[in-house]
Amino acid sequence: MTTVTKHKVLLIAGPTAVGKTALSLALAKQLNGEIISGDSMQVYRHLDIGTAKIMPEEQAGIPHHLIDIKNIDQRFTVAEFVSRTTALIIDISARGKLPIIVGGTGFYLQSLLAGYQFGPADNEPDMAYRQAWFDRAAVEGSDVAWMALKQRDPQAATAIAPANLVRVVRALEYVHTTGQLFSEQADTHGDTLDAYTLCLTAERALLYTRINQRVDQMVAAGLEQEARWLFDQGGAMLPAGKGIGYHEWFPYFNGEQTRDESIAKIKQDSRRYAKRQLTWFRNKMSVDWINLLEHPELRASIDQRLASWLS
């Protein structure tokens, strides 16, 4: 029997403005780690302020990956994230270091952990198909998805527990999008990770205050000028032009709203995004929650949890 090497991977997740970057730097130093960005916008060159990108001089000598790898007119898909991150995990682990993935793009992180497979003609997952099964299972129970898989790929159904809805839906989606049996493709990724996920959180009022303050700091640092440059390059027509902190400026540049209205909209969109992030991590992923902003004394408990996981 072939023994599959399980790579240790630490994920630091959570909503925007909750303190992920500071914790990731501390843990990377402590655990001899390298950091992989799990943020869908930090891949873009020249967009530094609005993405809260950690700059080279702030990285404290810790290698950072998946930052500044795309031009603003290039798409960055979840399939590419999974592929690139998988390769990085293998490389970092082979060099005796710990891969630490930091970010708030929940779907990217979930896809990595669940080991979603993306065929060559299927560069993006079928979100509607996937969500339809999750919705149906919420009403009829997870067995309904497993029974469907049993009909379409009995061997896969035998290998997957009916209660493991994410994996069952993943198998159904693979059959649906590729026309091939899930049981016949080599799952070379999802089951080879020994992942531990810390999810930072905070009381909502405090989090929203921090978000508003962060937006003000970004504006003071030159966010408007960064957004104006993006607007002049094509704005909303570009993949990068859809990001929060950027597209809200475009109506102002077009003379359709005031500057203050644009800033207020960025704050509103950022707060709503943080709420969606928390909901995603709560409902879609298995995480250990921790509130360091209000309870810094819990930092020691993180070390204890990690020591147990790494042993």
UniProtKB/Swiss-Prot annotation:
Substrate binds at residues 16-21. It holds the Pfam family IPPT. InterPro entries: Dimethylallyltransferase (IPR039657), IPT (IPR018022), P-loop_NTPase (IPR027417). One of its GO terms (biological process) is tRNA modification. It catalyses: adenosine(37) in tRNA + dimethylallyl diphosphate = N(6)-dimethylallyladenosine(37) in tRNA + diphosphate. The keyword Protein biosynthesis does not apply. ATP binds at residues 14-21. The record marks 105, 130 as: Interaction with substrate tRNA. GO terms for molecular function: ATP binding; tRNA dimethylallyltransferase activity. Its cofactor is Mg(2+). Keywords: ATP-binding, Magnesium, Nucleotide-binding, Transferase, tRNA processing. Catalyzes the transfer of a dimethylallyl group onto the adenine at position 37 in tRNAs that read codons beginning with uridine, leading to the formation of N6-(dimethylallyl)adenosine (i(6)A). Belongs to the IPP transferase family. This is tRNA dimethylallyltransferase. It comes from Lactiplantibacillus plantarum (strain ATCC BAA-793 / NCIMB 8826 / WCFS1).
